[in-house]
Amino acid sequence: MGRAFEYRRAAKEKRWDKMSKVFPKLAKAITLAAKEGGSEPDTNAKLRTAILNAKAQNMPKDNIDAAIKRASSKEGNLSEITYEGKANFGVLIIIECMTDNPTRTIANLKSYFNKTQGASIVPNGSLEFMFNRKSVFECLKNEVENLKLSLEDLEFALIDYGLEELEEVEDKIIIRGDYNSFKLLNEGFESLRLPILKASLQRIATTPIELNDEQMELTEKLLDRIEDDDDVVALYTNIE
């Protein structure tokens, strides 16, 4: 991954440490999961994962419980919507939102793109084929070692659950599999009693591009505006 990417990720992680921004997005994911599959984590894998990701960000239990209860109230009237856009330098953007007001959401997104010359929202389906959807799980390397497993053991154990790729990054291990293998991979971790640090469904560009520092700085202004929107829960680009 290029220096511009690392600069962007470092800047984003620093800003996302502001819990006032992170918690509402996590709460929306919990509420929607509970609304779709019920309020019991034991029987709702999507809710279980949303709670796990919230705990990884130190979200208080009271906030988590409140988000689950919200699913049965009028406040829980959320829907998932995906938007696509293009920016300068060949940048492609896919934006995943959870919103109770799609009209507001698309109006806000269009305003962000309009502030960036050369950027625009495009019809849904225009860019989706240029991204692969993947299940991505993270765990700590020392948790694997605590189970007396080598990386080869872990890879072999999870292949039958849909593992496609295993990568070691510093103190973490990243597992990737097909989008449709999310539930199965989750079951694989549970069968090993291996704690999951983070789990998500991601979109990975089939043909990533590299930007220089100046191009990245200009592009990040748009990406920051998008990610700051409370209705946006995930943003993917083709930037390497």
Curated annotation (Swiss-Prot):
<dbReference type="InterPro" id="IPR002876">
    <property type="entry name" value="Transcrip_reg_TACO1-like"/>
</dbReference>
<dbReference type="Pfam" id="PF01709">
    <property type="entry name" value="Transcrip_reg"/>
</dbReference>
<dbReference type="InterPro" id="IPR029072">
    <property type="entry name" value="YebC-like"/>
</dbReference>
<keyword id="KW-0805">Transcription regulation</keyword>
<comment type="similarity">
    <text>Belongs to the TACO1 family.</text>
</comment>
<dbReference type="InterPro" id="IPR049083">
    <property type="entry name" value="TACO1_YebC_N"/>
</dbReference>
<dbReference type="Pfam" id="PF20772">
    <property type="entry name" value="TACO1_YebC_N"/>
</dbReference>
<dbReference type="InterPro" id="IPR048300">
    <property type="entry name" value="TACO1_YebC-like_2nd/3rd_dom"/>
</dbReference>
<dbReference type="GO" id="GO:0003677">
    <property type="term" value="F:DNA binding"/>
</dbReference>
<dbReference type="GO" id="GO:0006355">
    <property type="term" value="P:regulation of DNA-templated transcription"/>
</dbReference>
<dbReference type="GO" id="GO:0005829">
    <property type="term" value="C:cytosol"/>
</dbReference>
<keyword id="KW-0804">Transcription</keyword>
<dbReference type="InterPro" id="IPR026564">
    <property type="entry name" value="Transcrip_reg_TACO1-like_dom3"/>
</dbReference>
<protein>
    <recommendedName>
        <fullName>Probable transcriptional regulatory protein HPSH_00820</fullName>
    </recommendedName>
</protein>
<keyword id="KW-0963">Cytoplasm</keyword>
<keyword id="KW-0238">DNA-binding</keyword>
<dbReference type="InterPro" id="IPR017856">
    <property type="entry name" value="Integrase-like_N"/>
</dbReference>
